[in-house]
From Swiss-Prot:
The lineage of its organism: Eukaryota, Fungi, Dikarya, Ascomycota, Saccharomycotina. Homotetramer. Coiled coil: none annotated. Its EC number is 1.15.1.1. One of its GO terms (cellular component) is mitochondrial matrix. Gene3D superfamilies: Fe,Mn superoxide dismutase (SOD) domain (1.10.287.990), Iron/manganese superoxide dismutase, C-terminal domain (3.55.40.20). This is Superoxide dismutase [Mn], mitochondrial. Its main location: mitochondrion. Binds 1 Mn(2+) ion per subunit. Keywords: Antioxidant, Manganese, Metal-binding, Mitochondrion, Oxidoreductase, Transit peptide. Mn(2+) binds at residues 60, 108, 198, 202.
């Protein structure tokens, strides 16, 4: 009944071909690259309390996410230089850094956007008349069931990783729940991330310590389903 795909089949890293194409463009004389930066937040750090503390949000945003931004920019600059010098071994090593930090950058951008304070609609379920709301009921029977399945996937992550609720355009716009290790992100063009959930310790440990099940349970109070509805239209 449920359309839940195995993470081993759908967790996708950026391809070598894509990375090479990016570096080719970056190395061209006519290409001007703007550096990546942190996204602007739609709420104050403390606005997601008591479910996610302001302290966690501040450190998560200004330290962890900023580090991915810094490392991504630095890795790209180094890769452009290495390509211009024909340093193939260095390019191969930097490709891994670009994939990791690029994934960390993208995943966290999704994370901040799919959060909303309760005062701004956080936790309010999708509209029953929306395409997303209708698809959830059709596939899972209720939003609670989708959340239950997603929490089960989150609990199964060994070490650090992410869970994504995605729209599968290749399968009739069904909803899938997938997980990724570390900072791997969703790159399949047929999969549209609707909700991204950070299962790294830095996302919860200061508040929930080793009881991450409580974090998984409580974060749904500040999930921005309106944003998920918007993404489902893509």
């Amino acid at each position: 009944m449920f359309s839940i795909r195995s993470s081993s089949r759908v967790l996708l890293k950026a391809s070598s071909a894509t990375t090479r194409a990016t570096l080719n463009a970056a190395a061209s004389k006519t290409f001007t690259r703007s550096k990546y930066s942190l996204p602007e937040l739609d709420y104050e750090f403390s606005a997601t309390e008591p479910y996610i503390s302001g302290q966690i949000n501040e450190i998560h945003y200004t330290k962890h996410h900023q580090t991915y931004v810094n490392n991504l920019n630095a890795s790209i600059e180094q890769a452009v230089e290495a390509k211009s010098k024909g340093e193939v071994k260095k390019l191969v090593a930097l490709e891994k850094a670009i994939n990791f930090n690029g994934g960390g950058y993208l995943n966290h951008c999704l994370w901040w956007k799919n959060l909303a304070p309760v005062s701004q609609g956080g936790g309010q379920p999708p509209s029953e008349d929306s395409k997303l709301g209708k698809q959830i009921v059709k596939q899972f029977g209720s939003l609670d069931k989708l959340i239950e399945i997603t929490n089960g996937k989150l609990a199964g992550i060994q070490g650090s990783g992410w869970a994504f609720i995605v729209k599968n355009k290749a399968n009739g716009d069904t909803i899938d729940v997938i997980t990724t290790a570390n900072q791997d992100t969703v790159t399949d063009p047929n999969l549209v991330p609707l909700i991204a959930i950070d299962a790294w310790e830095h996302a919860y440990y200061l508040q929930y310590q080793n009881v991450k099940a409580d974090y998984f349970k409580n974060l749904w109070h500040v999930i921005n389903w309106k944003e998920a509805e918007r993404r489902f239209e893509f």
